[in-house]
Amino acid sequence: MKKTIVIAIAGLSLAIAGCASSPNLDESFSDIGANADLKGVLFADRTHDYGDVDITIFEGRLMLTGTMNTEEGRRKLIENAWKANGVDQVIDEILIADGTSLGQGFEDTRIDTTLRAKLIADGDVKAGSFKTSVSRGVVYIIGVTPSERQLNAALDIARSIGGVEKVVSHMLVRPL
């Protein structure tokens, strides 16, 4: 029981720390709520398989990546995404295809982990100003950066990682 409580507190601490790195704490909590809303709706919907869909939200902009088996499922996913509280924009990067293979899933995880580590280590990039998702070797980046220089630095880092097929940016440049 104590172990469960400690793990829950540690998880909550990490979530709050992640929120604190965002430019706007209220938007971070709103993003967490929107993410939970949408995941709850998708979990309850047994008509489509959403197992290969990644949901990434940043300041009310919800990015959907991954694969769906049917166009009907993709449309339903987008419809549900707009219903989540706090969502101002839905970015559809869903591919209609068979689900990602186990090997490709491991490769995507390796790319994502490498990218996050390199972004955190880079002095020119503020890692808390964006989020990433990787699907089938394609890196998707969403967030806000204060300059084109920081944006280009982040994109160059993503492109430099072995196994990356393409980098898709949904970044906004918003000077301080």
Task: Set out the residue ranges of the language-model regions.
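N-terminal targeting leaders
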Residues: 2-176
